[in-house]
Amino acid sequence: MEALVYTFLLISTLGIIFFAIFFREPPKVPTKGGK
């Protein structure tokens, strides 16, 4: 059970950091949406 909790927390932390960097610095990839 503890392994599941630790894994979930680890993935959640990595996900939050990833999205924080992603939204702070938009990828320089041409998108059809524009903006």
Swiss-Prot record:
GO terms in the biological process aspect are:
photosynthesis
Q: Where in the cell is it found?
A: Plastid, Chloroplast thylakoid membrane
Keyword tRNA-binding annotated: no
One cellular component GO annotation, for this chain's record? chloroplast thylakoid membrane
TM region positions: 3-23
Membrane-related topology note = Single-pass membrane protein
Known SUPFAM superfamilies for this protein?
Answer: Photosystem II reaction center protein T, PsbT
Q: Which InterPro entries match?
A: PSII_PsbT, PSII_PsbT_sf
In the record, the note on similarity to other proteins reads:
Belongs to the PsbT family.
Per UniProt, subunit arrangement is: PSII is composed of 1 copy each of membrane proteins PsbA, PsbB, PsbC, PsbD, PsbE, PsbF, PsbH, PsbI, PsbJ, PsbK, PsbL, PsbM, PsbT, PsbY, PsbZ, Psb30/Ycf12, at least 3 peripheral proteins of the oxygen-evolving complex and a large number of cofactors. It forms dimeric complexes.
**What does the UniProt function comment say about this protein?**
Found at the monomer-monomer interface of the photosystem II (PS II) dimer, plays a role in assembly and dimerization of PSII. PSII is a light-driven water plastoquinone oxidoreductase, using light energy to abstract electrons from H(2)O, generating a proton gradient subsequently used for ATP formation.
PANTHER family associated with the record: PHOTOSYSTEM II REACTION CENTER PROTEIN T, PTHR36411
From the Swiss-Prot or TrEMBL record, give the protein name. Photosystem II reaction center protein T
Q: Which organism is it from?
A: Welwitschia mirabilis (Tree tumbo)
Give the encoding gene's name.
psbT
